[in-house]
UniProtKB/Swiss-Prot annotation:
Pfam families: Complex1_49kDa. One of its GO terms (molecular function) is NADH:ubiquinone reductase (non-electrogenic) activity. This is NADH-quinone oxidoreductase subunit D. It comes from Burkholderia lata (strain ATCC 17760 / DSM 23089 / LMG 22485 / NCIMB 9086 / R18194 / 383). NDH-1 is composed of 14 different subunits. Subunits NuoB, C, D, E, F, and G constitute the peripheral sector of the complex. Coiled coil: none annotated. NCBIfam families: NuoD, PRK06075.1. It is a peripheral membrane protein.
Length: 417
């Protein structure tokens, strides 16, 4: 009897559902996946090596470009590692601002994920809904840092600047009439904090809309329930973290288990799944957005009542004031030295991990006492998740591979780095 050979199929790297530059070599028996072999490295930019030739502060913008939909959380892990080595205390207000923007970034990431995941599976409307909300949060990024994506807002010792008193408003143009302009600017008359407060006041209704479209949708459940099941034991063995681990029923969240900044003061719950399939991971991420609203509201309330500095008073690390530089020669020299030579970090090594929207994002930093890192190692959550793809996809159809890639929430900037 003739032996039937498996059929090999290249999925990506130019595939719209490949989430970047994933090349997946699938071994198929008919339409059933026997083996999935991910090929990585197509977006490798040598970030870890580049950091060795840049001062500590010059590497902050590289962090934004790792997972380019969770920008500020990447920066957070990096500056925490530097602060551990320097042994400096970050002002309380800066810690609250960081936590607030971590949660804004988490919502940004999950909105991108829910839109793209639904689009991959075949539900287009959610993508348009999610981007409507992302636009407001992108405007918040722009208001505090001047950039919509690559913010470089977190700095060793604090944040670049305090939250501005005025939220930028849309201007009149050929494509906007007065009525449309008034509606777009109605929440922008106050400060940035007022705008964020207004956003999180109306955001729960938006999450309800996504759930109305998806959670009980018959087709959505047929495509996700029972697909890509990972047992709790295997999830731990494969190094899964974040929603991928919590979807399998393990309540591991660094914000609770190893709290950093002011997360130990925050009141929130850690959602966990039951079955460890794509549907449970979807439910976990949707609930995470609701918990981010709770955390953000607590931060907003505290920030309203407690003004103060947002940068450390350690002048080895903190730049001088703009006013001082215009009148004082010493301040100008200090500023020049800080941004050309940088600051020297004591010899030693440190590991800092943050609860990234995708999992545990860690930075292992080795310093030899110079103004540049001796070695920088990035622990990207997506790397372990992609490694589990073969096991998760075996026995499923080709169409299910798209669902599994979507549920892993993969971004190649951090995997290839």
């Amino acid at each position: 009897m003739a032996e039937i050979k498996n059929y090999t199929l290249n999925f990506g790297p130019q595939h719209p559902a490949a989430h970047g530059v994933l090349r997946l070599v699938l071994e198929l028996d008919g339409e059933v996946i026997q083996r999935a072999d991910p090929h990585i490295g197509l977006l490798h930019r040598a970030t870890e090596k580049l950091a060795e030739s840049k001062t500590f502060i010059q590497s902050v913008p590289y962090m934004d470009r790792l997972d380019y939909v969770s920008m500020m959380v990447n920066e957070h892990g990096y500056v925490l590692a530097i602060e551990k080595l320097l042994g400096i205390e970050v002002p309380e207000r800066a810690q609250y601002i960081r936590v607030l923007f971590d949660e804004i970034t988490r919502v940004l990431n999950h909105l991108m994920w829910i839109g793209a995941h639904a689009l991959d599976v075949g539900a287009m409307a959610v993508f348009l809904y999610a981007f409507r909300e992302r636009e407001d949060l992108m405007d918040v990024y722009e208001a505090v840092s001047g950039a919509r994506m690559h913010a470089a807002y977190y700095r060793p010792g604090g944040v670049y600047r305090d939250l501005p008193d005025a939220m930028p408003q849309y201007k009149a143009s050929k494509i906007r009439n007065e009525k449309a302009l008034a509606k777009m600017n109605e929440a922008r008359s106050g400060s940035v904090l007022d705008f964020i407060d207004d956003f999180f006041a109306r955001f729960p209704k938006c999450v309800d809309e996504y759930e109305t479209l998806l959670t009980d949708n018959r087709i959505w459940k047929q495509r996700l329930v029972g697909i890509g099941v990972v047992s709790p034991e295997r999830a731990l063995q494969m190094g899964l973290t974040g929603p991928m681990l919590r979807g399998s029923g393990i309540a591991w969240d660094l914000r609770k288990k190893q709290p950093y900044e002011v997360y130990d003061r925050m009141d929130f719950d850690v959602p966990v799944g039951v079955n460890g399939d794509c549907y449970d991971r979807y439910l976990v991420r949707v609930e995470e957005m609701r918990q981010s609203i709770r955390i953000a509201k607590q931060c907003i309330e505290w920030l309203r009542k407690n003004p103060g500095p947002v940068m450390t008073d350690n002048h080895k690390v903190a730049p001088p004031s703009r006013v001082g530089m215009k009148t004082n020669m010493e301040d100008l020299i200090h500023h020049f030295k800080l941004f050309t030579e940088g600051f020297h970090v004591p010899e030693g090594e440190a590991y800092a991990a943050v609860e990234h929207p995708k999992g545990e994002f860690g930075i292992y930093l080795v310093s030899d006492g110079a103004n540049k890192p001796y070695r920088l190692k990035i622990r990207a959550p997506g790397f372990a998740h992609l490694a589990s793809l073969d096991e998760m996809a075996r026995g499923h159809m080709i169409a299910d591979a798209v669902t599994i890639i979507g549920t892993q929430d993969i971004v190649f900037g951090e995997i290839d780095r």
